[in-house]
């Protein structure tokens, strides 16, 4: 069952909660677990901002599919490659064959080191001040 939250008319939180963890980074107490934030922007084009930890993949994917409501996912924006933010990249590439992954050069260096999937023709490498237009929403890359 999906669990999402509208942030605005066009932005929906599609992340999830992991109540199993008691320590963040095995150091800091988190008595109520941790929340993995991911946002889906629906415009002329669609963009998912980050993914989540593998421990909540099922919930996360249900949230995305529910929010897309049959629409295609155009872009996945990867802000950084920590495992709790990028564990679902491969699954999204499989589910959405036209999906483009947006990130900086280091993102794709790390992605190729961590994963064994083909990114040929599926990446958009951004540099400072590049923009990504989804329609009414435009994202500007600030490094």
Annotate each predicted stretch with a short phrase.
Residues 23-24, 88-89, 112-113:
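Short glycine-/acidic-enriched loop or helix-start segments at secondary-structure transitions
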Residues 5-9, 103-143:
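Metallo-beta-lactamase
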Residues 44, 55-102:
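Active-site metal-binding motif and surrounding structural segment of the metallo-beta-lactamase
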Residues 4-64:
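Conserved beta-strand hairpin/beta-sheet module of binuclear metal-dependent hydrolase folds
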């Amino acid at each position: 069952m999906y669990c999402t939250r509208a942030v605005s008319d066009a932005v929906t939180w599609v992340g999830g909660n992991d109540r199993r963890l008691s320590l963040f980074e095995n150091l800091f107490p988190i008595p109520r677990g941790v929340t993995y934030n991911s946002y889906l922007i629906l415009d002329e084009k669609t963009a998912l901002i980050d993914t989540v930890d593998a421990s909540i993949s099922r919930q996360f994917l249900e949230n995305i599919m529910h929010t897309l409501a049959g629409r295609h996912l155009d872009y996945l924006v990867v802000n950084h490659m920590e495992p709790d933010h990028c564990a679902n990249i491969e699954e999204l590439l499989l589910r959405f064959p036209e999906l483009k992954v947006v990130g900086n050069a280091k993102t794709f260096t790390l992605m190729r080191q961590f994963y064994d999937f083909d990114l040929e023709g599926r990446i958009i490498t951004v540099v400072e001040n590049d923009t990504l237009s989804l329609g009414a929403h435009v994202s500007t890359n600030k490094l």
